[in-house]
Each structure stands twice: as structure tokens, then as C-alpha cells.
Regions:
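An N-terminally biased module of ancient metal coordination in phosphate/nucleic-acid-related enzymes
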Residues: 1-85
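Extended substrate/RNA-proximal surfaces in nucleic-acid metabolism proteins
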Residues: 60-138
Length: 138
């Protein structure tokens, strides 16, 4: 495995958004590459508190990372629309249990659901037969 060019990575994704690794795999790969500080910043998804660790069951992700020599920061990458373009803002050190974050997570879920409905509508309009209920059941 190639050594990381820097010991800090403050913008990573897991399978919870558009990454390829589970939280466990992300930490293990970071540790193997010499990363000392790692932020999990999935798109519009609150960071995981725990992860499934092979042979150990579910563990606190920050504590597991620490045991691997990695300081883990729980973050999020917010998708934002502006009048010019879509932008992404990385949030680190957030109050994950606070009212403001709970409200933002609700807004994100509503926004994503509306976007999926609109995408299906557009695909149907262009002749691709899709049913939202069927998609949600997958």
C-alpha cells in the first residue's frame, strides 16, 4: 500500500455516501498508509458513531481509530445550492446531538427525497419507466 503524501486527511467518504470503504476499512487503510488524523465527511450524512469491526462486533469508531494510531474527527460534507452553482461545505467538530444539527439532518433527508422524486419524474418523462415505490423497496 502506498504511503499517504500527508499525515492528515480531512475530507474522506465511506460507503455511507460515495466512498468505497466501510468506516472500518477507511480507518484501517488510513492507518496502513501512515495517516495520523482522519476526518470522515460523508455527503449529507451524519458521521457514524460506531463501526462493525471483524472479530470484535460493533465498536465506537473514534476509539477504534485511536487504537490504530489514528485520531478520527467526525464530520459531514453539506451540499449547498447557491445562485451560481452547487457547493459543498465540510463541517468538522459539530455538535452532533444538538437541536441545530438535528434540524439540518431533517432538512437534508427531505431535500434528498424531493431530489429523488424529481429525478424519477424526469426519467419517466424521457421514457424510462421507473416507479418511486419500487426504487425505495430496493
Amino acid at each position: 500500500m502506498t504511503k499517504a503524501p500527508y499525515p492528515v486527511d480531512l475530507h474522506t467518504h465511506t460507503v455511507n455516501s460515495d466512498g468505497n470503504d466501510t468506516p472500518y476499512e477507511l480507518v484501517m487503510n488510513a492507518a496502513a498508509r501512515g495517516v495520523k488524523v482522519l476526518a470522515v465527511t460523508d455527503h449529507d450524512v451524519p458521521p457514524p458513531r460506531t463501526a462493525q469491526i471483524p472479530g470484535n462486533g460493533e465498536m465506537d469508531l473514534v476509539e477504534f481509530a485511536k487504537a490504530q494510531g489514528v485520531a478520527l474527527i467526525r464530520g459531514i460534507e453539506f451540499s449547498c445550492e447557491t445562485s451560481v452553482q452547487d457547493v459543498h461545505i465540510v463541517g468538522l467538530g459539530c455538535d452532533w446531538d444538538g437541536e441545530i444539527m438535528a434540524e439540518e439532518v431533517k432538512k437534508i433527508a427531505h431535500s434528498k427525497a424531493a431530489a429523488y422524486v424529481e429525478t424519477v419524474r424526469r426519467l419517466n418523462e424521457r421514457g424510462y419507466a421507473m416507479d418511486m415505490e419500487e426504487i425505495l423497496s430496493l
